[in-house]
Amino acid sequence: MKYKDLRDFIAQLEQSGQLKRISREIDPYLEMTEISDRTLRAGGPALLFENPKGYTMPVLTNLFGTPDRVAMGMGQPNVAALRQVGIWLSYLKEPEPPRGFKELMEKLPIFKQVLNMPTKRLSSAPCQQRVLEGEAVDLDQIPIQHCWPGDVAPLVTWGLTITRGPYKKRQNLGIYRQQKIGKNKLIMRWLDHRGGAIDFREWQEAHPGERFPVVVALGADPATILGAVTPVPDTLSEYAFAGLLRGSRTEVVKAVSCDLEVPASAEIVLEGYLEPGEMAPEGPYGDHTGYYNEVDEFPVFTITHMTMRKDAIYHSTYTGRPPDEPAVLGVALNEVFVPLLQKQFPEIVDFYLPPEGCSYRMAVVTIKKRYPGHAKRVMLGVWSFLRQFMYTKFVIVCDDDINARDWKDVIWAITTRMDPARDTTLIEHTPIDYLDFASPVSGLGSKMGLDATNKWPGETNREWGQPIVQDEAVKQKIDALWDELNILG
């Protein structure tokens, strides 16, 4: 099912028992986090806090708190169907013309979906029902969560940051956390390789000293939100991909203060600029690693205009030790990554990012091994193929008889098919998430590859063990007798 806006999605969730309204007064300071965390860990519903302490604006959390709700938001019936989204992305990343009528018919659904990718620009929109500017801009009107006791200030977590660089026609949408430091100021925490940071860097090169226009949208429709966290090709706007997911063109409206386009159905829109050279210390904050991060400097976002619906809803989340909402997103988006990797490496059978590993710091890959050294080629490919895996510290490669998603299977392969000296690959001085305080230098560390495959001639001179497998005829005979034996009661 497709959803025209966030409210349509909320209504469908409520109808199916996947949204809980909380009318009791709950404090955005710590209390919402504790309730949301307990609910998410229990696989519970999305939460709509209707009476935040000190505010009149309701707060929506845990929207994507289960993998199935992520799939729903992407217009798919279940998590397994997200493989289709990965197939679309692999085609968009490297499109190939059909080689005949049969292949044309096979690709026709993709071609039809591509027609929904251009945006539809409106002259007016719900997100601009109220317009505040200048002194009237006041972030204190928004019940921004203060998630953890050691957090330095309230934190905007689900803002879709919209930018455009000087050399690209497409707009970039990214989700970067933003620390509140004043009534009209936030700190824009983005890493150097992210689209918004690249746009800002190129802007400063092309327009030195000039202010960089930025818009942050809160509470967009689910396809647009999830498009911003999906690994779309660099040449494609997340708006275009959202249209493909939704099956209808993304409706946008021109921002009040600049030429950037904002989601027409968004609940709240913050418009403003980054002043070159204006930086501020960000953090510490409790993060998806389960620790408080170090303080570092990032650009300051000055808000000149705040537009919103008349009865706006604030969409929020928290991050902490997995499972949290980003970890749940990681579980669902894992299915999107598989077809992308398989197009480049057809020998890959499965690919798994364990949520316990922060959903990106460790990967388990199973392959149909074809030659000596094959596992090392795959691990190097994983690190270099998609930007999303540049911070993956550990890659474990196993044969296709191993279930990548079963730790008992994976550990058995590691302990029976690996020699630590021969089968471990260490690479130093590689990009590492700056939040990873275990690395010796901020932003620079090492990677480890583990070849847990069966070894071929050339990789070992020893006779290799054969796995124990029961005789199939005996298994079938005992299957027929099992209930009669009544061993387990």
UniProtKB/Swiss-Prot annotation:
Pfam families: UbiD, UbiD_C, UbiD_N. Gene3D superfamilies: Single helix bin, UbiD C-terminal domain-like. Binds 1 prenylated FMN per subunit. Mn(2+) binds at N172, E238. It catalyses: a 4-hydroxy-3-(all-trans-polyprenyl)benzoate + H(+) = a 2-(all-trans-polyprenyl)phenol + CO2. Keywords: Cell membrane, Decarboxylase, Flavoprotein, FMN, Lyase, Manganese, Membrane, Metal-binding, Ubiquinone biosynthesis. Its EC number is 4.1.1.98. GO terms for biological process: ubiquinone biosynthetic process. The keyword Transferase does not apply. It is a peripheral membrane protein. Pathway: Cofactor biosynthesis; ubiquinone biosynthesis. The keyword Lyase applies. It is an enzyme of class 4 (lyase). One of its GO terms (cellular component) is plasma membrane. The active site is at D287. GO terms for molecular function: 3-octaprenyl-4-hydroxybenzoate carboxy-lyase activity; metal ion binding. Prenylated FMN binds at I175, Y176, R177, R189, W190, L191, R194, G195. Catalyzes the decarboxylation of 3-octaprenyl-4-hydroxy benzoate to 2-octaprenylphenol, an intermediate step in ubiquinone biosynthesis. Belongs to the UbiD family. PANTHER family: 3-OCTAPRENYL-4-HYDROXYBENZOATE CARBOXY-LYASE-RELATED (PTHR30108), FERULIC ACID DECARBOXYLASE 1 (PTHR30108:SF17). Homohexamer. This is 3-octaprenyl-4-hydroxybenzoate carboxy-lyase. It comes from Aeromonas hydrophila subsp. hydrophila (strain ATCC 7966 / DSM 30187 / BCRC 13018 / CCUG 14551 / JCM 1027 / KCTC 2358 / NCIMB 9240 / NCTC 8049).
